[in-house]
Structure formats: structure tokens, C-alpha cells
Amino acid sequence: MKKTFVKILSKSYVEGYPVGFFIGLIILAIFGSMVCIFSFMHYSEEENSNIQMDLERSSKQIIHNIQMNAMYLLSSIDTLKALYYVNPNFDRNDFNVFLNTTLKNSEFQYLFWIKKINNNDRNCFEEKFSKEIKDTFQIYSFDENTNSIHVAKNKSSYFPILHAFPDINKDIIGLDINSTDYMNETIKKSIFNKKPTVHLNKKVLLSKRNIDILIVSPIIVTKTLESTNETMEDMSHISSGLFLMEKNVQASRIEVENGNDFTIFLSTTNGEIVYQENYLNFKTLYQVHESGLFEDRLKYESSLKIADCVLKLWIFTTEEYENNSKTYLPLLVSIISAVILVLLITYSVDQRKQKSLIAKIMREKNNLINKILPLEVSVKLENGEDVVAERSNNACVFFLDIAGFTRFSSIHSPEQVIQVLIKIFNSMDLLCAKHGIEKIKTIGDAYMATCGIFPKCDDIRHNTYKMLGFAMDVLEFIPKEMSFHLGLQVRVGIHCGPVISGVISGYAKPHFDVWGDTVNVASRMESTGIAGQIHVSDRVYQLGKEDFNFSERCDIIHVKGKGRMKTWYLMGKKSSDFSLKKDFSRSRVQPSLFNRKQSHVHCIYPEFPSGLQALNIENNLNNTDAGCENCSKILKKTYAYSPDHSTSNYYYHGDDNSPPPPSLNSNDLIDGSEYHDDPFPSDSNVGYHDTSKDIKEDENEQNETLLFNQEQLKKKQIENIQRDLSLNDSIEAIKILNNNNNNNINDNNINNTNLNNNNNDININNSDNVNNYENNNNFSDKIENNDGDNNNINDNNYKSTNENNIKSKTLFKDSKSLINDIKMAKENCDNNDDNNNNNNNNNNNNNNDENVESKKNK
């Protein structure tokens, strides 16, 4: 599903523009639209915020102007009281002259002078004041029920208005302000508070749209008062002022910029409206809120204080003001933001693409460096540090070689050989990562690894344990594919000690490697080991014997430059079920699987398919008779063992006539106690294939193979001489070469002799299986007694060849001028071959005669 989706996105309907590109454009357009909308909303909110700030600033200025006018009125009231204290008997002219010089903003407020008149003095005062003003004067009262003015009725005292500034309606002169109960409460409150008091009648507020505020300030004769009633009796005058609310609000908003673009409401703390616009007719603020007229308008809410009265202030913006205050800035900013965002995203995508490309190159470079060099070294190189060779005294070195790989590679295609190596080395790389082992290099079919070469790994015992565990896993997992299917096994050598590690780098191809005597010893452990086993030095044995099992007896081997060394074979870990002990016991009883004298034996298990197909490698060999279909061995003789009489699950290919051992399962221990006189019990289903017809053919094939091996050996030795031999040691080298050739020819003669003996044994076995098998053993003993020299050579054939090759390499040094000596050595080798072949034929004839005579004796 994921691959299909990626494929669809990669498909291009327009050249150079895949579907994914158009999808990206759509996403970009959507994202850009969202950014534009967000920018528009953001700057619209910012504009509204600016309008709100302007509203608050204007509202505060209006409130300030109203409060300043109220303060002027209060100061005028106090000034009028000061006039009384200076001249208690001032008349109207004095009143007008004084207020004209002191009162400000007289058009927004009125001042009243009120005097207390007792009922007994009413008539006398009216006559006297009429003469003073030269007009009729009477005391009137206000009827709240009829909302009318009439002559005041008799009562204990009156508070008529005597003077008013500026002149207003003459009907107000003589009006008793104490004619209503609510006004009486206001006067008492002002006397009690001893400060100016605002008179607001709720009934009047609800009946009128806009009202003016009356402020009263009493003048008390006595200073000590015991009760409010007594204070009312002692009060002589009242200085009062009328605050014209509508005129003051209009005057205050005119002084403010755009003040007329606001809608103002003034109300008491209970919500009764004191002031509103002329085109409105609300009684309370609740009605304003419920009307919904100002729901979408900006609002500012505050309060102001006039004398002792606190009023609530609501100011709303008008639609015209908001429209005039808004600009095209939000739209312009959103467009610019969209353009910038598109450019930024385009630039970011391009930069990201370049960074991804650079990061990909760097990752590939780092991965390549990490594959070539250890992590610690690659980190130093990345940080620009110089990589100097380091010495480690606690390293452990591992060598592995695939036994039989040369034969395998000679009969398979290069592609198959490479694929087999890749599969094997990939498995080993995974095991290295699992155990924390550092892979150093591969040389052909050899594998080298180390651990403990860096300073942080300074525990040699721990490093040895890691390497031994790694080696056991290698022998546990890898041989299952190689041995059972391909006829291949591995030899492993391990040694621990000091090494020097570093990077060898010229101008190209840096290479990390380790050097030292420890590396050489580990290589010797591998080369002198047994196929399918782990060969370790005595030092490794001493470090690991507490947790690992080793062979019961040590081996003594000769190591170049070291002399005789004690070595051991690793059997397994004590805490693990996997063990190499059974395979090791088999290798001690039987010759190596890869010895050319050893019969080729392997089992086909049901869980493993046959041959190269088990490793998913194509087999290009079409001739099925050329070799075994399950391995790389080219042999023709077959012994088939079929327990179920239907399918062959056991194959035996051999060069000799000896039957296979009773058990070839790698998990069955084969030692001397399990060998019987009869290799196959009477109840076993083993069928013998008659090979008497193929004896002569096998002899010819064997001779051709031996001659081919001789030629190859001579060529290799000549190449080694040409490369390594020095001029001073040329004569000695030629002698050694002749001796080696003679030894090899003798080995071949011995092999021919053994082949003839085996052929005779097969003829005898055809007459009587069991008895002839015993006689064959006795006859072999007789031959060994009669021909001791041949027996010794036969037992040490393979070992002598290896020792001769080692000696021929260790004694030679570099030389460049030995062509003539090489030709002489080759002629000597050819002569020796002819002589030895003649001796070979004579020995064969003698052996045949002895076999016939022995048969007659039996």
C-alpha cells in the first residue's frame, strides 16, 4: 500500500512536475490562505484595539471635563458661603457683583442663596424683601402630586430661594426647597455630613429624560449639635448650586477629538439614567443592554463623582466612527504576509532539499567510513583529529579460514563463489555486532577480527571471553550451511596479547589494520588447526579455562619465530549446551574431511535443501555426473543408506573401498569404543555398490589427479622461489626443492600402493563380507610389518607435505636473478618423477603377487 501511494505521488502527468508537486502546491495554497486570514483577523483585532484605546482616552477626557465643571460649581458654593461670612447682610447687588467676578462657566451652572424663615417672621420678611427687590415676593411650595407651584402653607419654617445667579425664571425666586419630603432628607443629610450633598429624586429621574443635579451646602450657626432636629433649627442659610448635566456633557465632549462620535449614558449606581442622547428614551441601563442597539459597538465603562454622588458612565462608539477609524492595513498586511510566506516556504523547501542532499551524502560518507574504520577512529576523523597508531596490551585476535574453499571455487562460477562468501561474511558481521567484536579485514576466504584494541577495553580476560563466545557462535551457526550443503568447514585461531593498531592512509583508500606478534601467532593458530575446530594458544587457555571447556590434552606445534608452543582446542562454554567435543573426537579418529585421502562424507537433513539451492544460489553446473548435487565434491562412487527403503537421506562418496562408518551424524561421538569389527550391524539397511568395474578407471583418474597436483605444486614452488629466494641461498633452495619433490613423489607412490591394496580388498570382500573384512585388516598389518618405510611415510604423508611447504617458505629470501637455477631444478624434478614412476610400477606388481599368495594361504 505504501509503495503504491509513493508510486502515485511520483507519477508525472506534466513533464517535470509529479503529482506530489501539485499536491504540495494545493497544501501550500491552503496554508497561505490560512496565514492571510489569520493576518487579516490579527490586524483587524489590532485596529479594534486601537479604536478601543481611542475610546478610552476620549472617555477619560470627557469624564475629566465633567468632574472639573462639578468642582467649579462646588468651589462657587463655598465662595458664596465665604461671602456670607464676610457680609451676612449682603443684598442682590452685592450677590451679583461678587459672582460675576468669581464664577466660571456660569452658562453650565446656577447658584442659589437660600435663607431660613420662621413662620412668625414670614409676613414681615415678605414685605421687607419685596421693597428690596422692588417686586412682589411670596414664598411658594412645590406639589409633587400635581407637579405645580402654589403659595406655601403655614409651617414652622421655610427655605425660600432669595438670590439666583445668573438670572433665570422669576418663578424660582421664593420657592421653598424644603417643600418635599425627599428634599428634606437631602438637607438633613447635608447637615449631618457637614459637606455639600447632591439631591436626586428617583421619581423625578424616572419621569424626565435628562435632569439637572442640585447640590446643597448648609450654613450652621452653632458648632455643637446633639441631634439632626436641633441642627435644622439652628441652620440659618443654605448655599446651593444647580449642575446642568446636559450642557456640561455637551461642553465636555466638544473639547475632545471625535467626541460627538460617541454615545454617552450617565446613571446612578442603581441604574437609573441621569443623562442620555436626545434621540434615546431609556429609563435604566438594563433597557439599554436588552435593546441590542449597541451589541456590535465598542464600549467603555467607568464612573465619575460629583460631590458625594457617584455616577456610572457608559460610552459607545458609533458605526460611522468605527468605519472611519479602520484602514486597509489588515488586508495589505495579509497579502504581504501571504507573498512573504510563499517565498519563504519556497526558499525553505529549496534549502531543505539541498540540506537533505548534503545530509544524505554525509550519512553515506559516514556509513562508508564506519564500515571501513572502527567507530572510535571514524569519530576522530570526523572531529578533525589526527589518528595516530595506538598500542593495546589487552587485545584478542581472531582468524578464520574456510577449508576446502579452493576446491569449491575451482568447480563453481565466480558469481556463485562471491555469493557464498557474501552470505558467510554477512553472518559473521552480524555476529561481530552482537558480541562487540571489531572486524578488521577479509583476505580471500579468510576473516580477521579483534577486540580490546581501544583504551576503554583494558580487561584482557573480558576481551578473551568475548572473543571465545564469538568464536563459538561462529562454529554454531555458520557451519550448518557450509558443511552440510557445500562441503566446507572453517578453521579458527585465537590468540591474545599486545598489538599496534592504526590507519594506513596515503592519498587514497585509508585502511585500518593491526600488527604485532599476537597477530602472527593467531594466524599460526588458524593455519595449524583442525577444520571445524577452534585452535587457541596456551595464554587464551589460561585466561578462559574457568568458564570454557577445552581439549583434555594440549598439542605441541612449531610456530615460525616462536619455536614449539603449547596449544589447545576450545570445546565450548560451560554454561552452554553447544559443544564441539563430539566433532573434535571424530576428527581425532578420522582424517580430516578435506584430506585428499579421506572419503567425502556428508548427511542430508530434511530441514536443509540440497546443495547451492539451500543458500539461494543458482547452480550453473548442468552435468549432474560431474559432482555431488549436494556439495562441491566431484566423485563417482556412492554408498546409499536408506532406512525407509524409499528416499536416500545419507550419501557417501569415497576414493577407497572402505565402507562408511556406522554413524556420520555430527552429534554422535565416534571414538575407539564405538568401532566394531563389523561396521554395519546385521539389521542395518546398507546396500553396497559393486565398484569392481570401476577400479581401473579410478586408478587412471587418481594418477591423472596426482600428476596434476605435482605440476601445480612445482609451479607454486617455482613462483615462491622466484619471489623469495635470494642469490646467496639459491643452491640450498634448489636442493630443498628437489627434496620436496622427491617426498611428494614418494607420497604419490604410497597412495598408488594403498589404492591397489584397497582394490584387492574389494575383490576379497565380494566373496565373503565379514571374514574378508577381518582378513583385510590382518593383511594390512602384514604389509605394514613387511614394509615399515612405506608405512611411516603413509602415516605422515599429509603432515610431511605441509611441513615441507612451510620449510620451503621459511628458508627462502627475496631474489630477482634465479632463472637458470629454476630451470635446473625443474629438470631434476622431471628426472626424479620418471624414476619414481618406474619404482611405482614395480612396487605395484610386487604387491599384487603378494596379495595372490596371501589369498591362497587363507
Swiss-Prot record:
This is Adenylate cyclase, germination specific. CDD domains: CHD. Residues 396-526 form the Guanylate cyclase domain. Keywords: ATP-binding, cAMP biosynthesis, Germination, Lyase, Magnesium, Membrane, Metal-binding, Nucleotide-binding, Signal-anchor, Transmembrane, Transmembrane helix. Belongs to the adenylyl cyclase class-4/guanylyl cyclase family. It holds the Pfam family CHASE. The chain crosses the membrane at residues 19-41. Residues 1-18 are cytoplasmic. Mg(2+) 2 binds at residues 401-402, 445. Its main location: membrane. Insensitive to guanine nucleotides.
